[in-house]
Amino acid sequence: MEELLMNRFVEIFGEKGTACYFAPGRINLIGEHTDYNGGHVFPAAITLGTFGVARKRDDQKIRMFSDNFKEVGLIEFSLEDLTYSDSDDWANYPKGVLNYLIESGHNIDSGLDVLFYGTIPNGAGLSSSASIELLMGTICNDLYALHCPMLELVQIGKKVENEFIGVNSGIMDQFAVGMGEKDQAILLDTNNMHYEMVPAKLGEYTIVIMNTNKRRELADSKYNERRAECEEAVRLLQKELSIEFLGELDSETFEQYQALIGDPALIKRARHAVTENERTLLAKQALTEGDLEEFGLLLNASHRSLKEDYEVTGIELDTLVACAQEQPGVLGARMTGAGFGGCSIALVPKQNIDAFIEAVGQSYQDKIGYAADFYPASIDDGARKLF
């Protein structure tokens, strides 16, 4: 792959690239819709991601090309004008990184040429945008010798998303992409950014990512709706409880005080936030102890809660997950990401992968009318220079 990209770089830019880089995508193992509820998330970097080949220029020109968006063509802009532009399309993500690195006082004194190529399916909810942001940060850090800590690049990536692009997302995606380690999941407390690396040794099992191939049109509007519902539940609970987030409660306390919320729909939303946070902490314990069966059961329980209490799944995700859970040897499956399309994950015996993909794929095609895509993935290192 790297050699192909080095040759492709010469085709596009006419000269050899000086180095090759990679930034992964991410999955969230468990802890869904907990980040804005003051809970824990449990992401991991994966083997799918974005490759980049780059070289510095001796002028102020930035030139970017993505083999995933060939139709957009070569995108050019100047270091002296790093404002958002619709015509720059996907390149606004790396452009934003350049903008905030310079704004933070880092010395980027000349332009560069960059070729991007991603193996993350677009729109699948596996953080292709965070992957591009951290890839660009890693390229700049290396080529301009910025000595910028990864955590700062993570925060710049989030700033690009929130302020440059205008998407109201948390820090989990960039954190996982930047800080990921091979065979380690990251338990992140979204309240205070405390994190710990947890061994995720899956032994004879592998994670299969299942893409519904359903466009996530509803995700943004429903995401904002759920967020508002949780905030309202907190406001009602605050009549008797001094809490700021649902993630501060355990199930027992929640059950004791849920009558304060009144509205049955709001109770369900809040119950998911509370129980999912508990499941995430139990999942950490299960992985630490090497108890993959328990970990799988927690994945199943998470999906059930997202389906019944949080109501963010939909027929496509439910079909994939239900069928996956029925396959021989599968320990667990759940949707991952915002929901309403996107992806789910399953913990599948390595020896059964082909049979699993065939059976679940056929069942999905029969019921939904179009194909799902399947990607076996391992937990891998974060953004890095390859050579």
Curated annotation (Swiss-Prot):
The active site is at 173 (proton acceptor). The keyword Kinase applies. SUPFAM superfamilies: GHMP Kinase, C-terminal domain, Ribosomal protein S5 domain 2-like. ATP binds at residues 66, 123-129. Pathway: Carbohydrate metabolism; galactose metabolism. Mg(2+) binds at residues 129, 161. Its EC number is 2.7.1.6. It catalyses: alpha-D-galactose + ATP = alpha-D-galactose 1-phosphate + ADP + H(+). GO terms for molecular function: ATP binding; galactokinase activity; magnesium ion binding. It is found in: Cytoplasm. InterPro entries: Galactokinase, Galactokinase_bac, Galactokinase_CS, GalKase_N, GHMP_kinase_C_dom, GHMP_kinase_C_sf, GHMP_kinase_N_dom, GHMP_knse_ATP-bd_CS. The keyword Ribonucleoprotein does not apply. It comes from the Bacteria. Keywords: ATP-binding, Carbohydrate metabolism, Cytoplasm, Galactose metabolism, Kinase, Magnesium, Metal-binding, Nucleotide-binding, Transferase. It holds the Pfam family GHMP_kinases_C. Substrate binds at residues 32-35, 223. Belongs to the GHMP kinase family. GalK subfamily. This is Galactokinase. It comes from Enterococcus faecalis (strain ATCC 700802 / V583). The gene is galK.
